[in-house]
């Protein structure tokens, strides 16, 4: 009504002091102001409609600075529609704008004699334009062309004259596309004062992170937008992974770093990792990375900054296998105290270690043999040359680790010089030959070496004709040969002498086997007998039958081999024909059938109905809107607001309910998805499952009513009450959640989003599973790294089993994994699983069998149950029925909950590595190989005799190669596990008494 004014006494309440509100800014977030009325002292001159609505007044803040405000209080009249529009605000190329409103609202109940149209809310709108074109009548004062941002409700209203309280609300809108915009405020019957309005936008400040520089970046068009900011490495840094970028989120905060830089060689981090500083002279850094510069190793130096390696001093070297951080070393001094012991044509050399090893521990010895000719006296110098290859060194000539060598097969009456060299890993780097100690010896007269081989020239029923080669080392003139022979079955030996290297043995028995040996003789005596050789005389009937008998095994073997080959060819042909008859789709011709036991209640997916409304009618109760009273907004959901209200059904007492509303302007798909949660909840009836009261679908807005849970979500409830509950109380909460999940699993329902944030708590600390809105189906798009569901939500990586992330295999077993994470959340009082690790780091850690450590004061039995839930093989995880039984036993046996892990909690404790099995838990070597996923080698281990853990613990890489483990990766895995086994054995050795 024209000329209407607020009731007497209300105006003073509409101009309270402006209280400063200090909000912690987001990490690295910047706010740039587009408009702020707080600092305006002259008239704002905004446009109001009608003129009797909003009124501009002056006031003072707490510092007595003048401020301009707008107020309205036409509560005595119904059907109010008062509009207020700001001046034109330039957008500055931003896509999303934030509005901070400071206002006061009077409680309608404190104003006497007012109609029921009094409100405590107002609406925020905006209108885009390319220039300042608005007038008093254009655009029309209504929603559309104006775009509604939100309905603004106060946190606190006031009722007394001296108790005005300032509310601060921040809302955002976008995306914006035109040059600027207007803000508009609609009052529909409130008594309020608009104290200040600030329009601003957010951006991520320029930052240096991970040795990379990222520029100042505007936020995106949506709160969930991620804007890519390309980065560049700082000076003296290099890229270690590409592309190098950082994401700016909608709150102006940097997140999700991709790629990284690190300090180059010769440079170390400085100024809190914002600089890479050159290493000063006398220090170096060999590898790129975040490590510091190090002093030069012994016997090395640098003379300039930014050195990546220190050069060795003169006569000092590094081996090719030495790292840059190794000390420079030198060659060893000669061996000491060489002793020779000659025995005819062989000798033994022994020596002592050099005085100076050159600073290395890879000392080896070489023995150089030289044969000398000529006089050793005054008649002239001797001429020496390298020995022949037939000289034998035991254990070897080069690369000796022992300080003793046996040398044989030398020539008799010959002078030799032996040089014993000391070498190490840098001897090849030195321009000088290895240092050595020499010894001269002369061999004595010696008997000839043994005859190498005997040959059969002919045989008969009574004789054998044999020949042989002369000894390799006759050591003089061969005088004759002596042959020893005897019939193998009798063992009585006879001898015969020959001047030549052949002989015929006569008077032998027919068809008999004889053992023959021969030796040579010089003036020094007989040499050793040759190795025994066996020869056989023929039978008197002739050799034809004997030849046939000798060839019979060959004939039989060839026949059998031919038959086996034919059988293999026939089998292969049959297999190929069978594969041709069975097409590639044969494996899909049979389908699995699910049989449900009589009387068992089974969950029915509402998305299987042709008409989703039919599922709602079948499983949810329709409630008349007159029975519902909305009291206040307590949150916002994906589809609309979440409110607290009351439900009064005929014949029943009034109860508090939580009300989810469907926002205005919904699509049919949004309505279907919104009501699908009611169709799901309506099928459940369990004290630990959130109860559906009903739905309102025949009026607007569409609503879902559930029981009201006073303590809201479990995670925030635990954080607010950190350390306030006993272990028994926490286990009781976990038991309730497990009981609810047991009920769901028995109904064949997979939750897929089990987390503490989706568990609601009532005033009696009863926990109930909620949030059944996650889509049951995931889009099969393997190129999408976020694994988004059909509702657009992302899979909660930190709570999801690895098979569900990798293959989207959601089962009750994957819910068990999530339950283990919920257990960890409860025992840590709402701490974030995996702390500040990125989602990709979490995936990698879980894939490498790392698990969360026990929270502070967590009973060992509970953490073991968590680890059981996090077993990689989903078939080995406990069922929810087993989890409930385990928790019941723990509750009955409270003493078991007093045993806690001694490790610290929180981020200071690393993730637990679950890959090292305790060998004492296995009964056989085969079980151990199965546990480390090397079961394919069980037969190889047993066949080679490694059937006990004591023998396995002594195995080397050569042993693995010998039994058939040829793959380098498998060798490494088995050897690492053997090393762990040795450590465990050392820790559990019994004490001898």
Swiss-Prot record:
Q: Which gene encodes it?
A: Ephb3
Q: Where is the SAM domain?
A: 920-984
Topological region Extracellular? 30-554
Reaction catalyzed: L-tyrosyl-[protein] + ATP = O-phospho-L-tyrosyl-[protein] + ADP + H(+)
Signal peptide residues are 1-29
| Record's bilayer topology term | Single-pass type I membrane protein
Where are the Phosphotyrosine residues found in this chain?
A: 609
Name of the protein in question: Ephrin type-B receptor 3
Which Cys pairs are S-S linked?
A: 73-191
GO MF term set? ATP binding; axon guidance receptor activity; ephrin receptor activity; transmembrane-ephrin receptor activity
Q: Name one GO cellular component term.
A: plasma membrane
| Intervals, Cytoplasmic compartment | 576-993
Keyword Glycosyltransferase attached: no
The species is: Mus musculus (Mouse)
Modified how: Phosphorylated. Autophosphorylates upon ligand-binding. Autophosphorylation on Tyr-609 is required for interaction with SH2 domain-containing proteins. Ubiquitinated by RNF186, mainly through 'Lys-48' and 'Lys-63'-linked polyubiquitin chains.
EC number, UniProt record: 2.7.10.1
